[in-house]
Amino acid sequence: MCAIAGMIGAHLEERSLRKLLETMQPRGPDGSGVFQNKNVTLLHTRLAIIDPAGGQQPMILDWAGERYVLTYNGELYNTQELRHRLISRGHTFRTHSDTEVVLHAYAEYGTGCTELFNGIFAFGVWEVNARRLFLARDRIGRALQRHAEEILRHGGPGQIPVQDG
């Protein structure tokens, strides 16, 4: 399993980012990534199983005037089916990872994308232009997600849609 984390409301210095990534590293020894934009930070450490070269995260997609940033942990069992469905709707893919399928599905279907997913997952998507964070996990909660009180303090529950798959 990978490790994902995020924060809204503070800009983390390089030293703090390194320290946080070190604590996440045992769950994701194959690579790490950080997205930081003003007061939003998304972090990811990766256990590479599918498409080791192409699934680096956080993953960014520019689609229909919005920039989406995804940090994801999980496994979709219907990746190929969803990929074909999204291709038929005009999406193109650079990787073979289920991460990219999750990102494109969110861009196409919004929060309803989780209804299409068959698998175990937890993820966060930051919509840069809309300044909106969406958090989701699978129906059973096998892939756990945690978020700090910092999120609610700075955004308020009405600003951060949270959905249990």
Residue ranges and their predicted role:
Residues 1-165:
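N-terminus-centric sequence/structural signature that marks the extreme N-terminus
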